[in-house]
């Protein structure tokens, strides 16, 4: 029994390109398939299975909090996902409930396809169920067995793609997005961009921390300067006073040294005078002795007394000096 493929929520932006790639070999326009439509109407359990599978896929592919990659196109995808869900729940169900009019009014199918087309194009997405239903309607009844085989292969292929989607779904999205004109980011490129942003943010944080540390050091140094500047000024004043005292002491030392030189010269002069007076005294004593001897020889007694008195006076003068 023919079954339509399940929905893949994460590939909503690439259904036009996906349908053109997967269904192009066997989507040749032919007569409407009445038998396929009647079998689809007679199987209402397929709809429940489709809804359960779509709900489970939507629950499995939600991005968790721990994911480190956040795509920049997430708001647009979320809006398109809501529109795609509303199309599946309301219009897609109404399309299958109206398939009982295929025998009576074949033109009604074209009208319904025309009505469903703008709704899908409003969100820039086309469901695989709609395109596959159109292909089933266009195939002749003679190709019913081949259609069933193609449906089974298509379901297996879609399910395998759904299983492989968490691992390499982004690469297939990039390949199909380039052909359909939609721009999808590569996860490696996203990681590289995020790493660059994080490194830039860390560098900015380090620069800000370094600047704040420099500002704190500058403020601390300014506070120390403001505290030590009065003490430095006081020490400068004391140094000036000490320099003045030092200069005065130097001048006094110079004066004292000059006085010492004068005193030394005066002492030398006095010593020379003492030597001269001693020599004079010795000469006078010798002359007096000679005179005394001469007088003693002549017999004059008064003159020796005078000579003795003069010699005593000279000795006193020498002792005083």
From Swiss-Prot:
Please state the span of the N-terminal signal peptide per the UniProt entry.
none
Every bZIP domain range? 186-238
Main function: Transcriptional activator involved in the sporophytic control of cell wall patterning and gametophytic control of pollen development. May play a role in the control of metabolic pathways regulating cellular transport and lipid metabolism.
This entry's Gene Ontology molecular function terms read: DNA binding; DNA-binding transcription factor activity
Q: Which residues does the annotated region (Disordered) include?
A: 97-189
Region described as Leucine-zipper: 214-235
What organism does the UniProt record list as the source?
A: Arabidopsis thaliana
Where is this protein localized, as stated in its record? Answer: Nucleus
Task: Describe tissue expression.
Answer: Expressed in vascular tissues of leaves, stems and siliques, anthers, filaments, tapetum, mature pollen grains, pistil vascular tissues and papillar cells, and funiculi.
Principal subcellular localisation of the protein: nucleus
Recorded hits in SUPFAM superfamilies, A to Z, give: Leucine zipper domain (SSF57959)
Q: What is this protein called?
A: Basic leucine zipper 34
**Which Gene Ontology terms describe the biological processes this protein takes part in?**
pollen development; positive regulation of DNA-templated transcription
Q: Where exactly are the transmembrane stretches of this chain?
A: none
- Region Basic motif: what ranges? 188-207
Compositional bias ranges of the Low complexity kind: 110-133, 145-155, 172-182
């Amino acid at each position: 029994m023919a079954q339509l493929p399940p929905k893949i929520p994460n590939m909503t932006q690439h259904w036009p390109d996906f349908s053109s790639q997967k269904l192009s070999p066997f989507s040749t326009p032919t007569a409407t398939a009445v038998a396929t439509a009647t079998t689809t109407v007679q199987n209402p359990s397929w709809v429940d299975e489709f809804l359960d599978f779509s709900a489970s896929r939507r629950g499995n592919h939600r991005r968790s909090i721990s994911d480190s990659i956040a795509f920049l196109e997430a708001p647009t995808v979320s809006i398109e996902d809501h529109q795609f869900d509303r199309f599946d729940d309301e219009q897609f169900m109404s399309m299958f409930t109206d398939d009982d009019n295929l025998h009576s009014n074949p033109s009604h199918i074209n009208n319904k396809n025309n009505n469903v087309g703008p709704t899908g194009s409003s969100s820039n997405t086309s469901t695989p169920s709609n395109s596959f239903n159109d292909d089933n309607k266009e195939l002749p009844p003679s190709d019913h067995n081949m259609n069933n085989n193609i449906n089974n292969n298509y379901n297996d292929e879609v399910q395998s793609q759904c299983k492989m989607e968490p691992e390499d779904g982004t690469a297939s999205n990039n390949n199909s997005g380039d052909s359909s004109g939609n721009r999808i980011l590569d996860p490696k490129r996203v990681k590289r961009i995020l790493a660059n942003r994080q490194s830039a943010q860390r560098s900015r944080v380090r620069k800000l921390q370094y600047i704040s540390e420099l500002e704190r050091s500058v403020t601390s140094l300014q506070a120390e300067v403001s505290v030590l500047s009065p003490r430095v000024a006081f020490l400068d004043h004391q140094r000036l006073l000490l320099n003045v005292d030092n200069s005065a002491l130097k001048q006094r030392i110079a004066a004292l040294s000059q006085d010492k030189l004068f005193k030394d010269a005066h002492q030398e002069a006095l010593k020379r005078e003492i030597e001269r007076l001693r020599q004079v005294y010795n000469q006078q004593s010798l002359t007096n002795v000679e005179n005394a001897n001469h007088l003693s020889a002549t017999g004059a007694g008064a003159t020796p007394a005078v000579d003795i008195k003069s010699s005593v006076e000279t000795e006193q003068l020498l002792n005083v000096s």
